[in-house]
Amino acid sequence: NYSLSSATLDINEKPLSLSGTKVYDALATAASSALTISGTVGGQDLTLSGNGTLSTGADVGANKTINTTGLSLGDGVSGTPGTASNYSLVGGTHQMSVTQKPVTISGSRFYDSTTNVSSSDINTFNNIVGGQTLAITGSGSVSTAVAGSGKTISLGTLTLTDGTGLASNYSLSSGTFDINSRQVNITGSRIYD
């Protein structure tokens, strides 16, 4: 009683997902250059431009959700180029992990015949971002007690603590230490001759 004369078919955009990792930089930014696109058909290549934002802020964390406003898909330019209009970032899973930023420390004291490095001897924190400050507790050591510069610190119990920045966003990777020569005063006397 019926015959099929025609039909229509809608082809919807395919949702894509984004993933990436960056080292803590005090910014809640998910830069396109740090993100990888997944979910294209047949491994088609697409480009990504702009910046997204991390919904839970800049701090270190795994699989933080990316707000994709500010990110744009573009046609592929290498491999098997894809057409951006066939795809969408709506409906995909978009996550970025933020890892701790390595920090190095340095300090100095005068010779005291020990190899101890106290937290109070540490005066420089290198590689901290955004004008932040950190503090430190605990103690470490150097290999020899003699005076010298650029000695490698065995970190021991040295631990970063919060300053204006959060210590949890950083990792203590290494340090150098100077032991300065101690001034010695000599006195004496003799009988007039």
What is the predicted role of each segment?
Residues 1-192:
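Short loop/turn motifs that initiate or flank beta-strands
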